[in-house]
Design a protein with these regions (language model features):
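A gly/proline- and charged-residue-enriched helix-loop-helix capping module
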Residues: 203-223
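N-terminal secretory/targeting leader peptides
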Residues: 1-207, 225-271
Length: 271
């Protein structure tokens, strides 16, 4: 989830004000990650109980069989990007595949303009994405002495629920100034953003954090800047899971004859 602000708006701030925005943005991302992970097990158990399904944990699965099934997908993805003219494809993939909340100072003396920014996300008001936006607004209002306020618009209300138009509105700077949207939606604008969804590139939450907060995340921020966006941090929606109504899945053999619905991504469909 890329937590971005329109670059023109960001560049209109002084360097010190930009530091405050970045600090608040990173704290909001850390907060979203924390609450996302804190409720993960509880949400899964409640969902399983309501739907009468069995949850198979990673430790009980033959993960190697899945890794073998998608062996070579990294090279496929690189070639796909190169065929579309993205010469940095290999470097981008290498960054992902190699080994690898509440306090803010008072900066109200920095002559902040009185303004209101609209935050958009595609999920509901009660989602961790919206909570992350609220945390950012809370931190910014405190840091600026109430001069900068943030309105929260969940479910992409400002663009009639259209996620792609939500990102386009962010690029335009109107009516959206800040947003948290999935890399899959961004991949409609630039397929390089699919690199985040390569299978088995994260061994753990700590590994994911290290990549998103390190060189890999810095590269993604560079690409976002090409679209007039300043990325304050990279949040998350948890690890992808396979669900079905037929039987328990422990190895790739259990996937035979199952029809699997995935998001509109060439990479996910290839997997």
């Amino acid at each position: 989830l890329f937590f971005c602000i329109n670059e023109n708006i960001y560049n209109s701030l002084t360097p010190q004000q930009q530091e405050v925005v970045d600090e608040a943005g990173q704290k909001a991302v850390e907060y979203e990650r924390y609450i996302n992970r804190s409720g993960d097990d509880e949400i899964k158990e409640r969902w399983a109980s309501q739907n009468g399904v069995t949850i198979t944990e990673k430790e009980d699965m033959d993960i190697d069989s899945f890794k073998e099934a998608v062996d070579g997908i990294d090279d496929w993805f690189v070639n796909e990007l190169k065929s579309q003219g993205y010469d940095d494809a290999q470097d981008l993939v290498d960054l992902f595949t190699k080994d690898s909340f509440n306090t803010v100072e008072d900066y109200s003396d920095l002559d902040w303009p009185e303004t209101t920014w609209n935050f958009a996300c595609s999920t509901t008001e009660t989602s961790t994405w919206a909570d992350g936006g609220r945390k950012f607004g809370e931190l910014m209002e405190k840091a600026t002495g109430g001069k900068v306020k943030v309105n929260i618009y969940a479910a992409d209300q400002l663009t009639n629920g259209n996620q792609s138009e939500g990102i386009q509105a962010l690029m335009n700077g109107d009516p959206v100034q800040i947003s948290m949207h999935s890399n899959l939606i961004y991949s409609a604008f630039d397929p390089r953003f699919n690199v985040v969804s390569l299978p088995f590139v994260y061994d753990s939450y700590d590994d994911a954090d290290a990549k998103f907060d390190g060189e890999a995340g810095a590269k993604l921020k560079e690409i976002l800047s090409e679209y007039g966006l300043h990325c304050m941090g990279i949040a998350e929606n948890g690890f992808r899971e396979i669900t079905n109504s037929k039987h328990e899945i422990k190895s790739v053999d259990d996937m035979k004859n199952l029809k699997v619905r995935v998001a509109g991504s060439n990479l996910l469909m290839e997997c």
